[in-house]
Design a protein with these regions (language model features):
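Intrinsic-disorder/low-complexity signal
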Residues: 1-165
Length: 165
């Protein structure tokens, strides 16, 4: 099990996962929101699941802090081909603990001019992360399938609708 990241915490991939790390995946997962319905005249009420739209992105920066490229649901691959987005999931749900969106990074193919990768998560539906069940993002060693780091958006995201991880 990897590091459970706290808000504002940074890690070095080389230090945490070792030099053998060649491919990583940023996974984003979340559940559908439970909404209570009142019914008609107090009858027929109950709960239903409501879709929630989260989105993962990756920003590539050079040593000077200049934005070099972006990968997100409208640009599924970096120009160099080293980073690929799985596509947009507009509803959430699915198997508990599974990734709804994935960004795969082939570290060996990332250009030397790229010094920093920043992952962002935002809520397109406007829900705060605290109101989205089981929301998380994680960094996975693609070879072993083990988490390198994990961030619990439902707990750490509080009232925010966007985070940079």
């Amino acid at each position: 099990m990897g590091i459970n990241l706290q808000k504002g915490q940074r890690i070095s991939l080389e230090k945490e996962a070792g030099r053998g790390l060649s491919r990583v995946v940023m996974g984003l997962g979340w559940g559908m929101k439970q909404v209570q319905s009142k019914g008609f005249l107090g009858f027929g009420g109950g709960s239903r699941q409501e879709a929630v739209g989260l989105a993962a992105s990756c920003l590539l920066f050079d040593a000077g802090g200049n934005l070099v490229d972006t990968v997100w649901f409208r640009q599924l691959e970096s120009r160099c081909g080293s980073i690929r987005h799985s596509g947009d999931d507009r509803s959430g749900g699915g198997e508990a603990g599974a990734d709804n969106e994935r960004i795969a990074i082939d570290l060996a193919r990332v250009p030397a001019s790229v010094q920093t990768l920043i992952f962002t998560v935002n809520s397109f539906s406007g829900e705060s992360f605290a109101g989205i069940p089981n929301a998380f993002c994680r960094l996975v060693d693609d070879a072993s399938g083990c988490d390198v780091a994990r961030f619990d958006l439902s707990l750490e995201g509080s009232s925010h609708t966007g985070l940079v991880t």
